[in-house]
């Protein structure tokens, strides 16, 4: 239990990229601390597995299959929520290729998911958080996942590195 010293009961957390890896681990840790979860991923099967684990921890869980690069989809998901206390902006993508061989469509997709979608989610959640009653008293948290790769160059990760700085 990573967040054992935290009491997140009555808090609602959104985690993107929640189906696998760090997103999955974050969602489960937040549930262990008592938060209710809204999990987002592109893969229903992964979401179902994580949702089941969260519910075993006695936390409420809503799951949404969504491509976060679709602004209208994420806006609809955010607008459906009665409140948001925490955003873990974790979803991301890497399509390794040597800089001289990066395809324009791959570069544009990585920028869209790693930068634009991250901004859009943070912006939409911040607007929702600001509207909450007692916001000054209870606060809110937005965590945008980054990577050490943003500080290290590499011949096959140039676009990813640029997006993760």
Q: What kind of feature is each model-predicted range?
A:
Residues 147:
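Residue(s) in the substrate-gating loop at a strand-loop-helix junction
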């Amino acid at each position: 239990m990573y967040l054992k010293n935290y009491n997140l009961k009555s808090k609602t957390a959104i985690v993107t990229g929640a189906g696998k890896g760090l997103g999955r681990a974050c969602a489960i840790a937040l549930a262990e601390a008592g938060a209710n979860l809204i999990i987002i991923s592109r893969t229903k099967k992964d979401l179902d597995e994580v949702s089941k684990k969260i519910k075993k921890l006695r936390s409420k869980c809503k799951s949404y299959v969504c491509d976060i690069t679709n602004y209208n989809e994420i806006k609809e998901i955010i607008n459906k929520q009665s409140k948001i206390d925490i955003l873990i902006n974790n979803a991301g993508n890497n399509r390794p290729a040597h800089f001289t061989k990066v395809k324009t469509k791959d570069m544009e997709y990585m920028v869209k998911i790693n930068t634009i979608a991250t901004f859009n989610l943070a912006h939409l959640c911040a607007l929702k958080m600001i509207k909450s009653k007692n916001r000054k008293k209870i606060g809110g948290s937005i965590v945008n996942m980054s990577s050490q790769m943003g500080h290290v160059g590499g011949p096959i990760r140039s676009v990813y590195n640029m997006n993760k700085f």
